[in-house]
C-alpha cells in the first residue's frame, strides 16, 4: 500500500521522478551554465564563440535563443510579463535552484472556495481514458471535438472546477465557467501564465466582466522556473501545463488551449481521464496553487488608467446649468473625445431674438433710415469676428445682426441727448466693461438673444428718461434707478451669452482648456466688480445729488449737450475718488 502524507511539505524528493532520485550529472552542466552567461552578457555572437572554444554542441536553437533574450530582465528593470511582482520561489532567495528547505517558511494559500474532501490514497474509481482530437477525423475516438468534449465535461461539474492553462481567450468557455459558477454554485479556480495574463484581461474587457467581482471564481498567476545569472539578470520560464480538474474525479488534459484557433484551426488533442490517476493531478494543482500569486495590482491599475474598465464605473450625467464647474467638466470631456460641433442655446437665442425685435420696433423712421447706412459695416464686423476661428459659420443672418446693432446705436444716442449727468455716469461703466469683455473673447459669437437683450434695457432707459424730463426731480431719481437696473441686466445678458465652450473643438491640448477656463473666471470676476462699481456709483449719485447737482437738475439747458458729455468722466471721478482731485 502506498505511503500516506498528511501535507505537501512531507513529500520526498523521490516523488519527482518515477525512476527514483535523478542523477546530478544529468541535471547540472557547468559548461552550459557558462554558455548561458555568455549569451546574456554578449548576445548570440558571444554564445556561438563560447561553444566553438569549449567544443560544445549547440543545445539551444535560434528560437530558444531569441526567447531567452526577450525574457531576460536586467537588474532594476521591470519585465512586461512579470508585472512588478516576483513568483513565490524567487521572492525569498536569489540563488539558481541551490536552496531546498525541508519545510516552507510561509503557509501556502488556502483554497478558500472549497475543495473535494479526498484524503491521500482514497479510492476514486477505476481509471478510464477518453481521447479527442482536433480537427475531428473519421478515425477520431469519441463523437466530439476537443472544445465540445471539454464544454460537455464542464456542464457535469457539481463541486469544483480547477483550470491550469497557458493562454485563455475563448469567450465561449469563459461564459460557460461564469454561468456554472453563478447558477450552479460551483467553485472555479483559474491559474494562468503570468506572461499571458494581459490577453485574459483583454477578453474580460470585451465581455464587460471584472474578474474580481465574481464571488465563486478566483484568478491567479503562475510562472515557470526562474534562473538567476551571476550578473543579476533574471530569466522567467513559461507555463506549458494544460489541464482541467473537475470535482476531483475527472481531468481533461492535452495540447488543447482555451483559444478559438485551437478549437477551429490548429491541430490539438484532449484526453479525459477518470479514476485513481486523477489523484496526481489533484496534488499537482495544489502545489501550483501554493506557488501562485494574485493578479498584480499594478497591472490592474494600468488597465484602469488606459480605460479598459471604464464601462464598469457609474457615470453621472452632467448638469445643464451654465456654471464654471460644469463648463470645465464639459471642456475636459470633449478634449478626451472626438471633436464635434456643439450648438449651445439655439432655441433660446431664437426666442430672445423675436422678443428683441418686438422691443426695438419702437425706433423712429429717421433713426432707422440713418442706421441702414451702417448695415454694411455691421456685416463686415460680423464676418471678421466669425473668421477668428477657422471653419465656423455665424449663428444668425447678417441682416439681423446689422439691425440689432443699429438699434442699440440709436438708443445710445437717445441716452446722450436726454439723459442727465448722473444717469450717464451710471450707464458708462457697465457699457464699457461689456465692450471690453466682448473684445477679449476670441472665437465666440454672441447669439441674437444676447444682442436683443442689450437693446431692450436701453429702450426702457430711454422711456424712463424721457418721462423724467416732464416730471419732478423725484421722478428723475426713479429713472436713474431704473437705468442702473437696466444697465446691470444688459451687462448680465451680454456676459453669460458667450462663456460657453467654442462650437468647434479641434485641439486636444490641455493649455487651450486651461486658457479658456481662466478667461471664463476672469469674465465672472469682472462682472462682479462691475456690478459693485455700478451700485457704488448709484449710491454716491443719490447722496451727492442734494449738494453737487441740484442746480443742474433744476436748470437743465438743452443747448449744453457737448459740455455735459465732456465733463461726464470728471463728475464720475469726483464721486468715486474725491481725495485725489
Curated annotation (Swiss-Prot):
GO terms for molecular function: microtubule binding; protein kinase binding. Residues 369-382 have a biased composition (Basic and acidic residues). It comes from Bos taurus. Phosphorylated during mitosis. All members of the FAM83 family of proteins share a conserved N-terminal DUF1669 (domain of unknown function 1669) domain of about 300 amino acids. This domain mediates the interaction with casein kinase 1 (CK1) isoforms. Therefore, it has been proposed to rename DUF1669 the polypeptide anchor of CK1 domain. Interacts with FBXW7; promotes FBXW7 degradation. May interact with RAF1. Interacts with KIF22; recruits KIF22 to mitotic spindle microtubules. Interacts (via C-terminus) with DYNLL1. Interacts with HMMR. Directly interacts (via DUF1669) with CSNK1A1 and CSNK1A1L. This is Protein FAM83D. Residues 426-438, 462-488 have a biased composition (Low complexity). The lineage of its organism: Eukaryota, Metazoa, Chordata, Craniata, Vertebrata. Through the degradation of FBXW7, may act indirectly on the expression and downstream signaling of MTOR, JUN and MYC. May play also a role in cell proliferation through activation of the ERK1/ERK2 signaling cascade. May also be important for proper chromosome congression and alignment during mitosis through its interaction with KIF22. Transmembrane segments: none annotated. Residues 88-98 have a biased composition (Polar residues).
Amino acid at each position: 500500500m502506498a505511503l500516506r502524507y498528511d501535507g505537501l511539505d512531507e513529500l520526498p524528493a523521490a516523488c519527482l521522478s518515477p525512476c527514483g532520485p535523478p542523477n546530478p550529472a544529468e541535471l547540472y552542466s557547468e559548461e552550459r551554465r557558462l554558455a548561458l552567461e555568455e549569451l546574456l552578457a554578449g548576445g548570440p555572437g558571444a554564445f556561438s564563440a563560447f561553444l566553438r572554444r569549449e567544443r560544445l554542441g549547440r543545445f539551444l536553437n535560434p528560437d530558444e535563443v531569441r526567447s531567452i533574450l526577450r525574457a531576460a530582465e536586467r537588474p532594476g528593470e521591470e519585465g512586461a510579463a512579470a508585472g512588478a511582482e516576483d513568483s513565490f520561489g524567487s521572492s525569498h532567495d536569489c540563488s539558481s535552484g541551490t536552496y531546498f528547505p525541508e519545510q516552507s517558511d510561509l503557509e501556502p494559500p488556502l483554497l478558500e472556495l472549497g475543495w473535494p474532501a479526498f484524503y491521500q490514497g482514497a479510492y476514486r474509481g477505476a481509471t478510464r481514458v477518453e481521447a479527442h482530437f482536433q480537427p475531428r477525423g473519421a478515425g477520431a475516438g469519441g463523437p466530439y471535438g476537443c472544445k465540445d468534449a471539454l464544454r460537455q465535461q464542464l456542464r457535469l461539474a457539481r463541486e469544483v472546477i480547477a483550470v491550469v492553462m497557458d493562454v485563455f481567450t475563448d469567450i465561449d468557455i469563459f461564459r460557460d465557467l461564469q454561468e456554472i459558477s453563478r447558477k450552479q454554485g460551483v467553485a472555479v479556480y483559474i491559474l494562468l501564465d503570468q506572461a499571458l495574463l494581459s490577453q485574459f484581461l483583454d477578453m474580460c474587457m470585451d465581455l464587460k466582466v471584472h474578474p474580481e467581482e465574481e464571488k465563486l471564481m478566483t484568478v491567479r498567476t503562475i510562472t515557470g522556473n526562474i534562473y538567476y545569472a551571476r550578473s543579476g539578470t533574471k530569466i522567467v520560464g513559461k507555463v506549458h501545463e494544460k489541464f482541467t480538474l473537475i470535482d476531483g474525479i475527472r481531468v481533461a488534459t492535452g495540447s488543447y488551449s482555451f483559444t478559438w484557433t485551437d478549437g477551429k484551426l490548429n491541430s490539438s488533442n484532449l484526453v479525459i481521464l477518470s479514476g485513481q490517476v486523477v489523484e496526481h493531478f489533484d496534488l499537482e494543482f495544489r502545489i501550483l496553487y501554493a506557488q501562485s500569486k494574485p493578479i498584480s495590482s499594478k497591472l490592474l491599475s494600468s488597465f484602469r488608467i488606459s480605460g479598459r474598465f471604464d464601462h464598469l464605473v457609474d457615470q453621472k450625467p452632467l448638469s445643464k446649468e451654465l456654471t464654471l464647474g460644469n463648463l470645465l467638466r464639459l471642456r475636459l470631456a470633449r478634449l478626451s473625445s472626438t471633436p464635434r460641433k456643439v450648438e449651445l442655446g439655439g432655441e433660446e437665442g431664437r426666442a430672445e431674438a423675436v422678443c428683441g425685435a418686438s422691443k426695438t420696433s419702437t425706433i423712429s423712421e429717421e433713426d432707422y433710415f440713418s442706421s441702414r447706412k451702417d448695415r454694411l459695416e455691421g456685416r463686415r464686423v460680423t464676418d471678421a469676428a466669425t473668421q477668428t476661428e477657422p471653419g465656423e459659420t455665424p449663428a444668425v443672418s447678417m441682416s439681423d445682426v446689422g439691425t440689432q446693432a443699429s438699434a442699440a446705436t440709436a438708443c445710445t444716442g437717445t441716452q446722450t441727448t436726454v439723459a442727465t449727468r448722473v444717469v450717464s455716469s451710471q450707464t458708462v461703466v457697465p457699457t464699457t466693461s461689456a465692450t471690453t469683455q466682448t473684445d477679449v473673447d476670441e472665437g465666440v459669437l454672441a447669439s441674437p438673444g444676447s444682442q436683443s437683450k442689450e437693446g431692450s434695457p436701453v429702450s426702457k432707459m430711454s422711456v424712463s428718461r424721457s418721462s423724467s424730463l416732464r416730471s419732478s426731480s423725484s421722478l428723475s431719481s426713479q429713472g436713474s434707478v431704473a437705468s442702473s437696473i437696466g444697465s446691470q441686466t444688459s451687462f448680465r445678458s451680454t456676459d453669460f451669452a458667450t462663456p460657453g465652450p467654442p462650437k468647434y473643438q479641434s485641439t486636444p491640448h490641455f493649455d487651450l482648456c486651461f486658457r479658456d477656463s481662466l478667461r471664463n473666471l476672469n469674465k465672472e470676476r469682472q462682472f462682479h466688480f462691475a456690478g459693485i462699481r455700478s451700485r457704488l456709483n448709484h449710491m454716491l449719485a443719490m447722496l451727492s445729488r442734494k449738494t453737487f447737482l441740484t442746480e443742474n437738475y433744476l436748470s437743465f439747458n438743452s443747448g449744453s449737450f457737448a459740455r455735459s458729455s465732456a465733463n461726464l468722466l470728471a463728475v464720475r471721478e469726483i464721486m468715486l475718488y474725491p481725495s485725489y482731485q
